[in-house]
Structures are given as structure tokens and as C-alpha cells.
Amino acid sequence: MAHDAGAFQLEVGVFPIQRMTFASETRYQSGSLSIDRAALLAAIAEPRVIADLEIYLAHPGESCRLVHVLDTVAPMAKVQGRSTVYPGFFGTTMPAGDGRNHLLGGAAVIVCATFPDPTSGALSPVEATIDMSGPAAPYCACSDTVNVVLVCHPAPGVSNADFDAALHRAKLKAAVYLARATAALTPPTVETYELSPVDPDLPRVVYVDQLHQQGLMAQTFLYGKHTQGLEPTLLHPNEMLDGALVNGNYRAPARAATYGHTHNFMVQELYRRHGQDVNFLGVVVGRGWQDSQVLKERQGWMMARMARLLGAQVAVMSADVGGTGGNNTIDFMQTIKACEQMGIQTVAVMQESGNPDGSDPTVVDFVPEANALISVGGIGWHTPAAPPVQRVIGGATVQPSIAEEPRDASGPLEVECWYGAIWKRAELGLSAVDA
């Protein structure tokens, strides 16, 4: 009998990681991962584009700071099934979301780099920093994971576009290489994800995810292709868990991350409640940052139309970068408006744009239909100053904002927003009072 490529039953074998060390072979044993640094370098090297690639380890609680952070990735590999993890970047592009993955729980691959050519305007990378300990650590994504850090330096004459493409390949290959150390092992725990039939009287819920897409350095990839021109698309939640979405957005420290897509807390919570108090129907993704008001309204109606055709009664929404960059917010609000007008009750999780004291408008755009908004605070909220650190990975200097001069990366540091702070706060469940 032919394999059913559309089964969408995904098993995830989780191997917990408490410690990583460099050794003569790559091997997992009892929560510890030994890494052959030379073998890992050989697996991901692209000397024509990346002239120098350094690999470091960073553990929670260390007096360590990571600078020039571009993205974070979950180490996982497909050990059974015909598709691949992170489909589209290598391997087949047949639908992901089934088979068995092995995941290194509590670990991440982090890529740090600066681009070779000068940039300006909106399509520019913005400094992102992670402190592994101290007062800022709770508000830094991946400060609580054991991290393999790739520090990449471009070869002479390489363009920003070619360097960026190589960084994507390097981080994803590293993630797969590390997880494959467990391929022949039996996982301590196995999590199974499938949208099994449930009580038809439960509320029918769809998750609507607005992706960020502007151009190079501010984009999201779906099955290996950027989402410029993407029409609203239906995904099985397992496709997200399998790495169908990959981050290429470096515009803000609060940016989305590939790790956040594969560990999407909205998807995980809806799965947890599937069959208990909700009937989780699936995920609708669409592109934010449409080019005109007409296209923003069109996008909203197309997203709502797809949710309605699924039979959704409720939509739960979120957006990359929190959804409140001025342009993105309009797209976000138009989707809420369209869903509500199509009879779909809509709850949206988003960041605020105002100051903590309430002196600025909370959001830059608003529609009356948006009557169930959940705030995870704003960009400049909950950004405690950090003391000096003993070790820095990624560079000798840091530039907290474009208005400031570079400074010693190991010294005391104040930033507008730590890496991944918005989705970290949402993950922590901070309330408006807390934030």
C-alpha cells in the first residue's frame, strides 16, 4: 500500500539537553550532548560565502552575552517519514507534518553575524542581544536553552543576499546534524500531534498567523520560498512544528524566530485543548505589510474567507513582530474586522506601541471590531539594564540603537528591547499588570 503523504500524524521524540561539550565525537547520553566541532564545521561549511565560521557553546546561568543575533533554530531531524524537517531548504518539498522527528529539548542553534554591505532604511538588520544570566535574561528568548552558537563572517565580495542564503543553510544544517546524534536511540518521551476527530459541539477554532514580509532581511520563508506575494494559505499545525516556516526577519530585536515558529505557543496550547474545550481546525497564514489599503482589506477578507470555509466559529490571531509596526497593524486590524463581520469571534494577541505610562496611543490603528485584544506589552517595556559580563560571543562591540555609537559588548548595557522579548513575554503569560 502506498504511503499516505497527507496523514499529518507527527511524533516528536524529545531528548532533553542539560549540557553540551566539545569532544572527539558527536554523541547523546543522559541529557548531555558531546559535539565533534570539526565534524559539525564540515557539515555546514560554505567557504565560498562564509569565510570564517566559529562555533561556541552557551549555557543558562553563564555570565555570557550573545550579540549580533540573527535567528534561533530548534535542533531536530526527521528519523521516520518521507518528508524532511525545514522543508524547502533541503530535501523534498512534499507536505511536512508527519512521520517522526527527534528533537533536542531545551537546546537551540543560534546564528550571529553582521552583513558585508551597508544597509539603510527599513530593510536593515537591527542589533539583537541575549544575556544568558542576570536581570535581562528572563526577557531574552533562548536565555534558558543550551545553545550552539554559530558566528559567521562573510567572504570578500559576497553580497548581502548570498550571505543571508548561506546563513539559512548553515543554521538549518547544524540543527539537523546535532539532532541526528539521537537517530538510533529511543527517546525518553514521545509527543504525538494529530487533529483527531472530537465532539462536534465543541467551539471550532482556527489559528490565524500574520507573517512578516518586506524583502531581504525582513521576510519569512514558507517551504523554502519567501512569502512575497503569498495568498492566504491553509497549513496543518504539524507543518509549523516540522519547520515549514523559517525566519529571515532581522528588523527588530523583538523579531520572530525559526525556533518560535516550531515551538509556536499558540499552536501548542490549541493542541493541548483540542478535544477538551475546543475543536482545533488548522492554521491560516498570510503576509503582513501589504502595499496599499485596498490590498490590506483584500488580505483581511481572504484570511477571513478561508477561516469561514473551514467552519471556524472563533479565530485566535497573532502576528510576527507583534503586529504593531504601523503598516503591519493595519493589515492585522483589517483581518480582525473581516473575521468579525463574517461571524467569526476573534481574539488577538499583540504588542502595544505606546509608552508604559499610557501617554502614547496603544496601537497605531484600530477598528471597533477589535474588542478582544490581549497585550504583551510594548517594545520598550520590561527592558532591565544589564551588568557587565565575563564573556561575549558574536563580536567585540554592540550598537544598542542606530542613534548610538558602538560600545564595548562586555560592559553594562541598556537596550530598547532584548532579543525575542515580545514573544518571550507572550510565552511567559505576563499580564498587563506584570508588563
Where do the language-model regions lie?
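Long, compositionally biased intrinsically disordered regions
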Residues: M342, A348, E369-A435
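Hydrophobic beta-strand scaffold residues
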Residues: F280, T346-V347
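Proline-aspartate-enriched helix->loop->beta-strand connector
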Residues: G311-V316
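Charged helix-capping and loop-helix junction motifs
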Residues: I330-T335
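Glycine-rich, charge-decorated loop segments at or immediately adjacent to ligand/cofactor-binding or catalytic sites
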Residues: V349-N371
